[in-house]
Amino acid sequence: MSPQTETKANVGFKAGVKDYKLTYYTPEYETLDTDILAAFRVSPQPGVPPEEAGAAVAAESSTGTWTTVWTDGLTSLDRYKGRCYHIEPVAGEENQYICYVAYPLDLFEEGSVTNMFTSIVGNVFGFKALRALRLEDLRIPVAYVKTFQGPPHGIQVERDKLNKYGRPLLGCTIKPKLGLSAKNYGRAVYEVLRGGLDFTKDDENVNSQPFMRWRDRFLFCAEALYKAQAETGEIKGHYLNATAGTCEDMMKRAVFARELGVPIVMHDYLTGGFTANTTLSHYCRDNGLLLHIHRAMHAVIDRQKNHGIHFRVLAKALRLSGGDHIHSGTVVGKLEGERDITLGFVDLLRDDYTEKDRSRGIYFSQSWVSTPGVLPVASGGIHVWHMPALTEIFGDDSVLQFGGGTLGHPWGNAPGAVANRVALEACVQARNEGRDLAREGNTIIREASKWSPELAAACEIWKEIKFEFPAMDTV
């Protein structure tokens, strides 16, 4: 009799409640290459042993429930159950543990981040026996990775489409984020693209509000980028936000963007949802559109150290679901992001293989086989003085995005774009000449500002601006 149809009728059914650890805590278990592995930060309630807490997580996120049920005998729990196979205390924290759980691959629908998360980060996060629970990392087996399309195009295809190599790409989020008419919005897009930026971006809040309906915005932005392309000889793009209240409206906007011939659209993947995101990603692959991803709502999920989901997990999920860019924090700007932790998940986005490295928060080695990489986008409170650090931290395969750091230039939008392009070109040239950007960054910017009045003005206006607060996200 096959494991799927094997029953336990000959053993007999014993009703009642038993400890989770009797079934789901298996320290002797040797993980399989096909298992999905999870590292949970578990904070048990007082009096709950860590073995019981870890087993409860494994049970409630796989086959278990609070009591023994008769229908357990109609399947093979050993085949399908999650297993807590290792527990270690968290250094410096009282009554907090990292519990490692292995899930058989058969528990999950192929190609569905939605289904994977519904199990692994579902009802178990409200379990009363736990004070708090955080998913720190996932190991996605190659067998499961290959069931996903992944990013529509990836880093190399994007560079080939844009014909831009050897430097980070430059972007700008149009501000104010809400309230502009479509024509004035398009004017700002044109001015900064003409000034030297590669991309402009809809703010994540911009969908189709009364002050600016989506179709009007798409038309004026397309006109702006084509005009800027004609004048500069460079390929330009604007992230047209296709996020909508329904998947049907989202796809209608993506189709219209394709008909306009623009190179890239955008989606808010957490508020929009993984099913919608994967659908849009497949459309973008089939129709030659790049896909920019914003992570609005991520801090609600990932910022608390002891509860939620770490962003490295959300980043892995995005690489599976599909996106060519994703916002990743800046390390040096106004938004949360500690350097080693940030670079840990940046590598998870870009590289084919990432080694386990607990100093960077990476709990498992991860292979992406042939899945394309995702460009990290550094955005939020950055300006020209940050350019050396951003270039050194993120390297060439990144998008450096300056909203207020472009449009806040005292001489206007186009000079703000010029200042950023000059600063970037100076940093890339200095790096290629062997100069140390971390040590000589300010000197490099000052030298460049001597022959660029736009950069000099930007340096003066933002010379005192710093965002220095301790990071919440630490190992």
From Swiss-Prot:
Entry-linked InterPro entries: RuBisCO (IPR033966), RuBisCo_large_chain_AS (IPR020878), RuBisCO_lsu_C (IPR000685), RuBisCO_lsu_C_sf (IPR036376), RuBisCO_lsu_fd_N (IPR017443), RuBisCO_lsu_N_sf (IPR036422), RuBisCO_lsuI (IPR020888)
Protein EC: 4.1.1.39
Co-factor binding comment: Binds 1 Mg(2+) ion per subunit.
Post-translational modification: The disulfide bond which can form in the large chain dimeric partners within the hexadecamer appears to be associated with oxidative stress and protein turnover.
Pfam families in UniProt: RuBisCO_large, RuBisCO_large_N
Keyword Plastid: yes
Active site residues of this protein: K175 (proton acceptor), H294 (proton acceptor)
GO BP terms: photorespiration; reductive pentose-phosphate cycle
UniProt modified residues of type N-acetylproline: P3
Cofactor(s) listed: Mg(2+)
The keyword Thylakoid is annotated on this UniProt entry: no
Gene Ontology, cellular component aspect: chloroplast
Binding site residues for Mg(2+): K201, D203, E204
Free-text function comment from the UniProt entry: RuBisCO catalyzes two reactions: the carboxylation of D-ribulose 1,5-bisphosphate, the primary event in carbon dioxide fixation, as well as the oxidative fragmentation of the pentose substrate in the photorespiration process. Both reactions occur simultaneously and in competition at the same active site.
General remark: The basic functional RuBisCO is composed of a large chain homodimer in a 'head-to-tail' conformation. In form I RuBisCO this homodimer is arranged in a barrel-like tetramer with the small subunits forming a tetrameric 'cap' on each end of the 'barrel'.
Protein name: Ribulose bisphosphate carboxylase large chain
Lineage, highest ranks first: Eukaryota, Viridiplantae, Streptophyta, Embryophyta, Tracheophyta
